[in-house]
């Protein structure tokens, strides 16, 4: 084992993934294929605006671009004005980011008085969260680049499982390394080609953490007719949803059970809460409304602020993203006679 990455898990502890040297070489090869399919070339200068660290996205794309001989700017995420400065001064021709962060970059470009013609961007590889054709069109219009989707998950390898080519008619799967199946999410039985269901993947060459029929919980379908680009690998359609309750917020996997675990560990917090996800501008916003046990706490501004800060800090440790926390009166949130519907996702993706 030469490297370890991790993804979010339902318990709040990360799911740890191990890689051998052969795994890293295979990962680089898979990423290089998808980068070239998306239009990437040796002559490109690529800015990677994924966060570096245990998250697989940044290093996965990084080593793929280096494999094809491109110049890599490991900008990481955040400090967006600096990102734009780097992009302009270093002449970046390719951008790697979540689609929502790509759109936020476009807003900052505009605020800084920079025209898209002043940038040299020509392609964008976007992933880690769902995106619509409309979102891609906006990225194209605002940044002047050609956007493509790519797909992966840490348990399988990270990014590099599948990606769009320049014809954008499904994501080509590296099926010599990852064997895909579609199953009915209720019966768990395989279904016919072209039907929508849950994607299941078996790793064929991975050594550090092989997976046999791993349920991704992602809903898609397989496309087996020949692509106009000439590649003959099977393709998968855009992800249409999940078969579990996982949310993807700013590229991070978030489970309601993680949030509940944090809230229920705090004696001042009551048992009822709601989770609201919305997209403000082009960035996802996570808001958690939660009842306090003692209504008197709401009249003590100092104690209230301290508790909000404490809840936010604990959530940040578990979720790895910031959340807005609102403390409300006991018995003020909606009650449910059946299964509680605690999550409201207002994003239109």
Placement of each model-derived feature along the sequence:
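Conserved adenylation A10 loop of the ANL superfamily
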Residues: 1-17
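Short, charge-rich binding segments
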Residues: 6-9, 34-41, 86
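Short acidic, glycine/Ser/Thr-rich loop/turn "cap" segments at secondary-structure junctions
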Residues: 12-19, 42-50, 87, 92-94
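Conserved structural elements of the adenylate-forming
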Residues: 16-38
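Conserved AMP-binding loop of ANL adenylate-forming enzymes
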Residues: 35-70
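Active-site glycine/GP-rich loop and adjacent strand/helix microenvironment
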Residues: 68-349
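Short glycine-enriched loops at secondary-structure junctions
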Residues: 24, 51-53, 100-101
């Amino acid at each position: 084992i030469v490297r370890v990455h991790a993804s979010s898990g339902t318990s709040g502890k990360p799911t740890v993934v191990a890689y051998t040297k052969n795994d890293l070489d295979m990962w680089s090869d898979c990423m290089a294929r998808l980068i070239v399919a998306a239009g990437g070339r040796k002559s490109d200068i690529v800015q990677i605006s994924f966060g570096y660290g245990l998250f697989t996205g940044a290093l996965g794309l990084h080593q793929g671009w280096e494999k094809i001989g491109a110049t890599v700017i490991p900008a990481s995420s955040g400090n967006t004005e600096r990102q734009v400065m780097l992009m302009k001064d270093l002449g970046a021709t390719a951008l790697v980011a979540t689609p929502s962060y790509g759109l936020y970059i476009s807003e900052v470009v505009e605020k800084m008085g920079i025209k898209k013609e002043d940038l040299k961007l020509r392609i964008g590889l976007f992933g880690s969260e769902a995106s619509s054709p409309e979102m891609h069109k906006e990225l194209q219009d605002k940044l002047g680049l050609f956007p493509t989707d790519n797909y992966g998950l840490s348990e399988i390898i990270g990014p590099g499982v599948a990606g769009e080519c320049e014809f954008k008619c499904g994501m080509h799967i590296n099926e010599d390394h990852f064997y895909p199946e579609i199953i009915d999410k209720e019966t768990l039985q395989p279904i016919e080609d072209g039907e929508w269901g849950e994607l299941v993947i078996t790793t064929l060459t991975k050594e550090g953490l092989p997976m046999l029929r791993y349920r991704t919980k992602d809903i898609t379908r397989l496309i087996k007719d020949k692509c106009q680009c000439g590649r003959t690998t099977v393709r998968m359609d855009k992800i249409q949803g999940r078969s579990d309750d996982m949310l993807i917020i700013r590229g991070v996997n978030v489970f309601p059970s993680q949030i509940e675990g944090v809230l229920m560990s705090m004696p001042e917090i009551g048992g009822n809460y709601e989770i609201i996800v919305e997209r403000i501008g082009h960035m996802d916003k996570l808001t958690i409304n939660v009842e306090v046990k003692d209504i008197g706490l709401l009249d003590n501004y100092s104690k209230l602020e301290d508790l909000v800060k404490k809840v936010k800090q604990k959530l940040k440790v578990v979720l790895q993203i910031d959340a807005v926390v609102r403390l409300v009166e006991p018995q003020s949130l909606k009650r449910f006679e059946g299964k509680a519907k605690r999550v409201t996702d207002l994003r239109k993706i």
